Amino acid sequence: MGAVADLKRRGYNPQPLRRVHIKKSNGKLRPLGIPTMKDRAMQALYLMALNPVAETTADRHSYGFRRERCTVDAIVQCHTILSKEVSPQWILEGDIKGCFDHISHEWLLNNIPMDKVMLRKWLKCGFVFNKELFPTEEGTPQGGIISPTLANITLDGLQTMLAEKYHKKFVNRKTIYYPKVHLVRYADDFIITGRSKEALEEIKPLAVSYTHLRA
């Protein structure tokens, strides 16, 4: 009970993150920023309020780091889109390199619907590596409890943008244009479908520009 009562906003300042590296399947190292137990508990407390808000604006076909969703759901959606005779024949595959490490702090502070003072403290707390303190000027740590939700909010909206720009067009209730543009995203990995290579070549710079402004 004492630990719970200690989770107060007044006078709270997070400790610097502990930087560790884990080996990925390709042999490269992934940096993780590990908050203290108290800081993780405080993030979990604020995440309880942020998650329901994030769900109301989330992309419909975003499946990573969301409750009641998993990789199987993403696979099923891909099958639904691509298994028909009239399905799109072209796919643009995207992987936002170093997404967590390069998310714009300015964008987060301007757009995340939560206490900005607390968010700024978490983003700017720095990290310790080899007993040396380093500043954090961008990104949100992969070891943070709230980080996956922050990343999802950052990337949400791309599906809506594409749907508004590439939608079915009708004349006398007959479809005259069907671009077959669909987005399926799992965390920072996604695919975009299209009816032709030329269509995806047009879409690619839009997707790059959208993510570049945020991450």
Q: Across the structure, where does each feature detected by a protein language model lie?
A:
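Active/ligand-binding-proximal structured segments within catalytic/core domains
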Residues: 41-50, 150-151
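Conserved phosphate-binding loops in nucleotide/dinucleotide-binding enzymes
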Residues: 31-32
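Residues forming anionic-ligand binding surfaces in small-molecule and nucleic-acid pockets
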Residues: 24
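Conserved polymerase palm-domain catalytic core
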Residues: 6-10, 15-16, 20, 60-61, ...
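Active-site beta-loop-alpha junctions of metal-dependent nucleic acid enzymes
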Residues: 67-73
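Conserved small/polar residues in nucleotide/adenosyl-binding loops
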Residues: 211-215
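Charged boundary/loop elements
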Residues: 48, 52-64
